[in-house]
From Swiss-Prot:
The modification Phosphothreonine is found at T471. Keywords: Ammonia transport, Cell membrane, Membrane, Phosphoprotein, Transmembrane, Transmembrane helix, Transport. Belongs to the ammonia transporter channel (TC 1.A.11.2) family. PANTHER family: AMMONIUM TRANSPORTER, AMMONIUM TRANSPORTER 1 MEMBER 4. High affinity ammonium transporter in the plasma membrane. Specifically expressed in pollen grains and tubes. The keyword Disulfide bond does not apply. One of its GO terms (biological process) is ammonium transmembrane transport. It comes from Arabidopsis thaliana. Gene3D superfamilies: Ammonium transporter AmtB like domains (1.10.3430.10). This is Ammonium transporter 1 member 4. GO terms for cellular component: plasma membrane; plasmodesma. Its main location: membrane.
Length: 504
């Protein structure tokens, strides 16, 4: 907006002189324009400060999601593994911060670069730049550690701590940054912000990361859980699934609400700026990015709410009871799905997104049980499956006007197939699903396989039965009295004396 504020002394002189004393009029015009330029400069500074404050606040919201992940994970595992899963969430943030600082941000946004990987800003050298300031680094770091946090849930309760440390560093330092470069850097080969040679003339519109964050974390978790195998006792004779319930639905609900709160930084915050005008529109005197930010918060909310209610009634029909943890996962599945297209779809379309996301999650969970795939937090199904649906959804429902406002460029660029925009955007999004699946499978799948062969991945069976907390972390997360221990409240054997699974 500041660029529209300008002053021309030559235009002012005739107005000030009135045909006399042109020298004085010229001096007055120069003075007025000088003062005007000073005000315009301060206006530009204010806009910059507002945008950076908005981005910092969004980063703080997304970082708060780490607490949500920690609470969700803690409530979803058995009490004997609580300290372990909490520590992994802390390590995700700490190791991720160091490796994203050293390598990750450079690989993701180091410009000038090629279409595959960035090659500038290692260790934040030569930083900040006019295009990237410190708040942007902080914001992108919170996304990187979110992807790592997703993976930790898939391999919970049976993984050596050193494996967490290795995979978290590798994911945040290399695997995730390269994917984010492809789709979010202006140099990325599939970025919608490219100035030329857009993929299918549209690029990939993965606004806040259904693919970049959720699919990356979900597929990494898929490979980790596949290579490790299910937890002891998860499947009985003949492959019959045995429910290993988490120890605290209270923590699951707390974590879900913290994640919901943080998603208002995750999706609306991905605009990175808020002080930007789009111009006048019918029915309003002024219209800008602040309106798009608000719409994005609304679509995010509606998708999550619809998915939660769909899961509530869907699971009631399938299983015959109301389950709060299933509803929480359904809600998060709706959020993961809408993350791609939250900024470019109408609110009514978000209802479709959430409804389908709930059934995708329930279907993936049913398939996982049939294949004897064990993911304690349903992270691979939720983030991988619902994330993939969100990418497809955007290719179907993205609105032409919103794409033009946010990404600019050719006003006739492809948009959603069901909105009359042809199939090019959808084709680009199918490519995104394929390349993310391939890249993460090759990198993270190989890493987990190497850790498995080196016997650094899974803990010994006796430690798994006893619990990771007492065997690896110096004790349990909760204090128990002698009476509670004697009465079997702390540790009890599930399914009889011959059942190898010990519940807590």
């Amino acid at each position: 907006m500041a660029s529209a504020l300008s002053c021309s002394a030559s235009d002012l002189i005739p107005l000030l002189s009135g045909g006399a004393n042109a020298t004085a009029a010229a001096a007055a015009a120069e003075y007025i324009c000088g003062r005007f330029d000073t005000v315009a400069g301060k206006f530009t500074d204010a806009a910059y400060a507002i945008d950076n404050t908005y981005l910092l606040f969004s980063a703080y919201l997304v970082f708060a999601m780490q607490l949500g992940f920690a609470m969700l994970c803690a409530g979803s595992v058995r009490a004997k593994n609580t300290m372990n899963i909490m520590l992994t969430n802390v390590i995700d943030a700490a190791a991720g911060g160091l490796f994203y600082y050293l390598f990750g941000f450079a690989f993701a946004f180091g410009s000038p670069s090629n279409g595959f990987i960035g090659k500038h800003f290692f260790g934040m050298y030569d930083f900040p730049q006019p295009t990237f300031d410190y708040p942007y680094f902080l914001y992108q770091w919170t996304f990187a550690i979110a992807a790592a946090g997703i993976t930790s849930g898939s391999i919970a309760e049976r993984t050596q701590f050193v494996a967490y440390l290795i995979y978290s560093s590798f994911l945040t330092g290399l695997v995730y940054p390269i994917v984010s470069h492809w789709f979010w850097s202006s140099d990325g080969w599939a970025s919608p912000a490219r100035s030329e040679n857009l993929l299918f003339q549209s690029g990939v519109i993965d606004f806040a990361g259904s693919g970049v964050v959720h699919m990356v974390g979900g597929i990494a978790g898929l490979w980790g859980a596949l290579i490790e195998g299910p937890r002891i006792g998860r499947f009985g004779v003949g492959g019959k699934p045995v429910t290993l319930r988490g120890h605290s639905a209270t923590l699951v609900v707390l974590g879900t609400f913290l994640l919901w709160f943080g998603w208002y930084g995750f999706n609306p915050g991905s605009f990175a700026t808020i002080f930007k005008a789009y111009g006048e529109t019918p029915g309003s005197s002024f219209y800008g990015q602040w309106s798009a930010v608000g719409r994005t918060a609304v679509t995010t909310t509606l998708a999550g709410c619809t998915a939660a209610l769909t899961t509530l009634f869907g699971k009631r029909l399938i299983d015959g009871y109301w389950n709060v943890t299933d509803v929480c996962n359904g809600l998060l599945g709706g959020f993961a799905a809408i993350t791609s297209g939250c900024s470019v779809v109408e609110p009514w379309a978000a209802l479709v997104c959430g409804f389908v996301a709930a059934w995708v999650l329930m279907g993936c969970n049913r398939l996982a049980e049939k294949l004897q795939f064990d993911d304690p937090l349903e992270a691979a199904q939720l983030h991988g499956g619902c994330g993939a649906w969100g990418i497809i959804f955007t290719g179907l429902f993205a609105e032409k006007r919103y794409i033009a406002e946010i990404f600019g460029g050719d006003p006739n660029r492809p948009f959603g197939l069901l909105m009359g925009g042809g199939g090019r955007l959808l084709a680009a999004h199918v490519v995104q699903i394929l390349v993310i699946t391939g890249w993460v499978s090759v990198t993270m799948g190989t890493l987990f396989f190497i850790l498995h062969k080196l016997k650094l991945l899974r803990i010994p069976a006796e430690d798994e039965i006893a619990g990771v907390d007492p065997t690896s972390h110096g004790g349990l997360a909760y204090m128990y009295t002698e009476d509670e221990i004697r009465n079997g409240i702390m540790v009890r054997r599930v399914g009889g004396d011959n059942d190898p699974n010990v519940g807590v």
